Amino acid sequence: MGNIRRSRGYNYEHALVQKLNSSGSWRARRLGGSSTGLPDIVAVNNDDGVLLTIEAKSGASDILYVPQDQIERCLVIRNMFAIYPKRHIILAFKFMGKKRFRRKNETVYESRKLLEYYKVADALSSMKVLPIIIKCTYDGRTYAIYKRKTVSLDLPEYLMPFQKSAVQVSIPQETM
């Protein structure tokens, strides 16, 4: 199962890099696996002075998580490149077209709409205490998880250079 998750993550990161590199003045690079201590992707637009540090998550469940150490990596790179007037931390979430869950000790997959969200997480840099985990749900809501509590975290959508408009999704409560 671990290899499937790793390859799914790599494929998502690779696809994001390709989309960014095909978007005019943007240049993006995948920086390697989690053991590198770097964000998944760094993208720059030198013409407009924009730097994006991107942490990408993909999965077949209803919730995707970004741990604190991965947020810290994005903050370090974002702060290192102060020459860029516009620097953003982007949390990219891709919810696969099939939902995975357990039923009677079996793994079952159910078709659903594939959704992607790009959340601006710049507000995290001003927090005195970083959340242990950032959580994103299938409907695009984000939460900060601290030691003893979960709080709503309204991270705004980021319009990626390859998007025509930000994703606005309405999901009936019965599917959640």
Q: Where on the chain are the PLM-derived regions?
A:
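Acidic-basic catalytic patches of nuclease active cores, encompassing PD-(D/E)XK
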Residues: 1-32, 83
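Structural signal for conserved beta-strand scaffold positions within catalytic alpha/beta enzyme cores
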Residues: 30, 55, 91-93
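Short polar/acidic secondary-structure junctions
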Residues: 33, 46-47
